[in-house]
Amino acid sequence: MQKIKVLCVDDSALIRSLMTEIINGQPDMTVVATAPDPLVARELIKQHNPDVLTLDVEMPRMDGLDFLEKLMRLRPMPVVMVSSLTERGNEITLRALELGAVDFVTKPKVGIRDGMLDYSEKLADKIRAAARARVRQSAPVQHAAAHAAHAPVGAAPLFNNPLLSTEKLIIVGASTGGTEAIREVLVPLPPDAPAVLIAQHMPPGFTKSFAQRLNGLCRITVKEAEHGERVLPGHAYIAPGHAHLLLARSGANYIAHLSDEPPVNRHRPSVDVLFRSAAQHAGKNAVGVILTGMGRDGAAGLLDMKKAGAYTLAQDEASCIVFGMPREAIALGAADEIASLPEMSRRVMARLSSMGDRVQRV
C-alpha cells in the first residue's frame, strides 16, 4: 500500500515533532519532510511532491494565507490548515478555506496527553480526506448584493411566492469542504426564505466566527444557534461546535434545541441528529440537503427525512470536495434529487415554491 506523503509546515519545532509523531503512527501515511516556514516549504514541495500539506496559519517570513494563495494559484494541492483557538485564528482559518484549503484542525496541546488519541484520529481522518479531495483554485467571494446584481435581466427570482408560514424549513448537513458549500447555498437565498438549520462538522470556537462571516455575505440573518430560541424565517442557525442541534416544537412554533449528548458517528454536532429531529418534527414541511463531506454522517438521517415526507437533495460528485456523505446517502436511496452545488439553492427554492403557502401539519 502506497502511503500518503505529508509535508508539515509550522514555525514551532515542538509542533512539527508532535505532528510528525502522530502522522507517522498511522499505517497509511508518512511525513516526508517538515518546514519551519513557507519559503523552506516551497523548496521541499518541489523535492518531495507531497500528497497533502499541513500548514500553520500564522508564521514568520511569509504569512500562511499569502503562501496558500500563491500555492493554490500556481500549484494547487490538498492543504489542511493548523489553527490556534483564537478569534484572529478563526478568521484567518475561514479565509484559508475560501482560498482553497480543504479543511482545518486545531493545534495539538503540547504536554497534554488527555484527548491526544481523539486528536490523532481527527487529524488522520482529515489528512485522508484531503488526499482524496478535489482541489479547487480560489474563487472570489460573492456577496448577496453582487449575486442579485449579476442576475440576468428578466430572470425569475429564486423564490416567487413569499412563504407566509413559518412551517417550511431547510435542513443542511456538511463536513469536509462544507464551509464554502454552505456559503454557496446561503448567499443566493432571498430575505423571505424559510428558516435554515445547519450542522457542519466544526470544533468549538469556530462556528460563531463562521456564522458572523456568513451573516456579512447573505441577505438572510445567519447566527450560531442558541438553546430554546424560536426558529424564524429569513434566518439560518448553525450548530455550535460543542453541541448537537435538534429541531423541536413549542405549540405551533419551531424551537432550536442544543444537546451535549455524546458524539454520534464520532461527531458533535452530528448531521444525523439534526436530520432525525427534522424528520420527527417537520416531516413533509422540510427540505433536506446533504453536502460535501467524508464519512456517512447524515445519510441515515436523510433517509428518515425522506420517509417522513421531506424532499431530499444530495450534492453531486463533480462539485464535492469529498464525495463521502452524499455518496452514502445516494447509496441508501435517501436522495430524491442529486444537484450540483451551483444549482443547489435554486433547486431547493424551486421545491419550496411548489409547496406554496399551504401549511402542512405533521
Swiss-Prot record:
CDD domains: CheB_Rec (cd16432), REC_CheB-like (cd17541)
Domain (Response regulatory) ranges: 5-122
Pfam hit, one: CheB_methylest
Active site: S175, H201, D297
Record's keyword terms, sorted: Chemotaxis, Cytoplasm, Hydrolase, Phosphoprotein
Reactions it catalyzes: [protein]-L-glutamate 5-O-methyl ester + H2O = L-glutamyl-[protein] + methanol + H(+); L-glutaminyl-[protein] + H2O = L-glutamyl-[protein] + NH4(+)
Entry EC no(s): 3.1.1.61, 3.5.1.44
Protein's job: Involved in chemotaxis. Part of a chemotaxis signal transduction system that modulates chemotaxis in response to various stimuli. Catalyzes the demethylation of specific methylglutamate residues introduced into the chemoreceptors (methyl-accepting chemotaxis proteins or MCP) by CheR. Also mediates the irreversible deamidation of specific glutamine residues to glutamic acid.
Domain writeup: Contains a C-terminal catalytic domain, and an N-terminal region which modulates catalytic activity.
Designated name of the protein: Protein-glutamate methylesterase/protein-glutamine glutaminase
Gene assigned in the entry: cheB
